[in-house]
């Protein structure tokens, strides 16, 4: 639980990430505008921003992965995934800004500094308490 909270605290320090709550069955994409430091009460952590919040049962977080996933065309997504008891059970994902998109979600030339932020996080956490790095190919229908 300590590594989970350490990572959540660090991820909530900037409001340029997108938080996706839930997994394959139901999910909610949320801006991190106004995100606050997480608050712990018992086994639950509350993550809150200007227009949303969620309560995560820390006991359900059984895995953390730093993921680079092929997404649309030649673009990649960079995120941290908190998984549940079943590995495919995604609880929360935190997406770093896409290096191929500007702040208005318009396609631009690749911005390597956006990948650097992800890589710095990854390099600090992967290997600690079972945290993994995963590269995912594009999902086919």
Language-model segments: residues:
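N-terminal recruitment modules of adaptor/scaffold proteins
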Residues: 1-58, 62-68, 127-141
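Acidic, Ser/Thr- and proline-rich intrinsically disordered linker/docking segments
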Residues: 2, 11, 64-141
